[in-house]
């Protein structure tokens, strides 16, 4: 647990998150309009999305299946009866004057997600509910001094709102929770999790309290769209509330916005209660009634999720806990890894992905899907390393060329005339020349200056342009130094 340092004592964070995940579907929740991201404004809008009189909602069954799959993936209980309600409020990007949501009877309740806390211990974050609702349109206020612009392309896209219990005790835990939930959504293929495209957004409820005391007054930080912003917003807001309480004030229950440039939260409006929205069942939509056979069928099709994959990597492949967690955290990385190890050593593969390949990808800011290196070519490189056909130094050079060109390692080695010297006789002759040229250093080595061994290795590498087999160099050099006549 991370504490907030006040002037006189420590305070605890109490955090609950509401995650809004866009359901991965070609059509919207109640209309057949496209959900493709990046289209020109208001080009993917049907009559219902603009709330034209007489237009009626028709439920997209696929979105319901996606929500069931997600609920099962987070260990939630599926409700066989769920009902859509109207959430009434006015805003310019909500043309109907209400949002179709699920308040009284959500599609799923309960569930949990396990994360690692600051000490590396497993912590279970309880889920309160998962419900289906419409997304709103998007308002833009910075393109004109006199007008705001409305884009309804997003209006009506299916959302899953996943509400956690206030079990999160620090901004770091909040970040881990979102990363884990996003990974699960991507494995399930129910949401792409792209926060930069608005497919995953977060509202954070936060209060502070002294250890073992009653819960404080919570504030809600709205529309956080990156993990970095979530952490910064929670850190600032926690400290703000502590400062108010320690100065004798009271925290006002309100909705806040986070300014990422200033790193501060600002009041948006007083926080509403459920009664303010005047929820009532939508008269245009029948209840969702689910058969157990449908739920069982969806459950049987669930893929292996991150926690199960980590367990398999550790127990069967014998990866370290850390390597297993990093590889399993990203669905695409995991798929790449598993394709490579069909023909290559898994532990060596994991080490090279996490160190060398990640280093190149991070430098260029690309994902594994944008990387030119194929799984087959990477496997070929790992096989060359494990068979000692090339040294690690040569392999790093080849990998960089693979990364830049997309060519196979063997083609690169042919084009660059890269070939490891692995002939013991050839290496022995080179070592003889090095020792003769550095007679005085050999004398010093034999008199106890063991550190000179690295100097001799460097001289051999220099003569071979780094292409000699390092293990053979070490083995033969040890023998030659013992036998050298002084």
From Swiss-Prot:
State the name under which the record lists this protein: Aspartyl/glutamyl-tRNA(Asn/Gln) amidotransferase subunit B
Report any Pfam family annotated for this entry: GatB_N
Family statement drawn from the similarity comment of this UniProt entry: Belongs to the GatB/GatE family. GatB subfamily.
Q: Which reaction does it catalyse?
A: L-glutamyl-tRNA(Gln) + L-glutamine + ATP + H2O = L-glutaminyl-tRNA(Gln) + L-glutamate + ADP + phosphate + H(+); L-aspartyl-tRNA(Asn) + L-glutamine + ATP + H2O = L-asparaginyl-tRNA(Asn) + L-glutamate + ADP + phosphate + 2 H(+)
| Keywords carried by this UniProt record | ATP-binding, Ligase, Nucleotide-binding, Protein biosynthesis
Gene Ontology cellular-component annotations: glutamyl-tRNA(Gln) amidotransferase complex
Query: What's the stated role of this polypeptide?
Result: Allows the formation of correctly charged Asn-tRNA(Asn) or Gln-tRNA(Gln) through the transamidation of misacylated Asp-tRNA(Asn) or Glu-tRNA(Gln) in organisms which lack either or both of asparaginyl-tRNA or glutaminyl-tRNA synthetases. The reaction takes place in the presence of glutamine and ATP through an activated phospho-Asp-tRNA(Asn) or phospho-Glu-tRNA(Gln).
GO biological-process terms attached to the record: glutaminyl-tRNAGln biosynthesis via transamidation; translation
């Amino acid at each position: 647990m991370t504490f907030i340092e006040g002037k006189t004592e420590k305070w605890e964070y109490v955090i609950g998150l509401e995650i809004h995940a866009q359901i991965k579907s070609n059509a919207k929740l109640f209309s057949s309009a496209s959900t493709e991201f990046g289209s020109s404004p208001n080009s993917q809008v049907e009559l219902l999305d603009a709330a034209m009189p007489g237009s009626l909602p028709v439920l997209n069954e696929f979105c319901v299946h996606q929500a069931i799959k997600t609920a099962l993936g987070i260990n939630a209980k599926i409700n066989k009866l769920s009902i859509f309600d109207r959430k009434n409020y006015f805003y310019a990007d909500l043309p109907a004057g209400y949002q179709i949501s699920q308040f009284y009877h959500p599609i799923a309740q309960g569930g949990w997600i396990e994360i690692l806390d600051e000490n590396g211990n497993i912590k279970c974050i309880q889920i309160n509910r998962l419900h289906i609702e419409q997304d709103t349109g998007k308002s833009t206020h910075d393109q004109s001094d006199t007008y705001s612009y409305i884009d309804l392309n997003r209006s009506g896209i299916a959302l899953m709102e996943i509400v956690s219990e206030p079990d999160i005790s620090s901004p770091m835990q909040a970040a881990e929770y979102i990363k884990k939930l996003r990974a699960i959504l991507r494995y399930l293929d129910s949401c792409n999790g792209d926060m930069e495209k608005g497919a995953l957004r977060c509202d954070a409820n936060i209060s502070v309290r002294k250890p073992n005391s009653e819960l404080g007054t919570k504030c809600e930080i709205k529309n956080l769209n990156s993990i970095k912003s979530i952490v910064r917003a929670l850190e600032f807001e926690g400290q703000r509330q502590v400062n108010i309480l320690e100065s004798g004030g009271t925290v006002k229950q309100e909705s806040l916005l986070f300014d990422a440039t200033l790193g501060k939260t600002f009041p948006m409006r007083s926080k509403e209660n459920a009664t303010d929205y005047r929820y009532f069942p939508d008269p245009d939509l029948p209840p969702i009634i689910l058969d157990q056979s449908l739920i069982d069928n969806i459950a049987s099709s669930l893929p292996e999720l991150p926690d199960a994959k980590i367990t398999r990597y550790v127990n069967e492949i014998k990866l370290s806990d850390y390597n297993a967690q990093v590889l399993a955290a990203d669905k695409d990385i995991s798929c790449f890894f598993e394709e490579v190890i069909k023909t290559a050593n898994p532990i060596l593969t994991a080490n090279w992905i996490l160190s060398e390949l990640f280093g190149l990808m991070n430098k260029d800011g690309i994902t594994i899907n944008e990387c030119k290196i194929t799984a087959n070519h990477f496997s070929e490189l790992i096989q060359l390393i494990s068979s000692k056909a090339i040294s690690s130094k040569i392999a790093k050079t080849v990998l960089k060329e693979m990364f830049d060109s997309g060519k196979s390692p063997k083609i690169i080695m042919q084009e660059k005339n890269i070939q490891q010297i692995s002939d013991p006789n050839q290496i022995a002759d080179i070592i003889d020349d090095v020792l003769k040229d550095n007679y005085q250093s050999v004398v010093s080595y034999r008199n106890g200056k063991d550190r000179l061994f690295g100097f001799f290795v460097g001289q051999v590498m220099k003569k071979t342009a780094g292409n000699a087999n390092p293990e053979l160099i070490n083995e033969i050099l040890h023998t030659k130094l013992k036998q050298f006549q002084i």
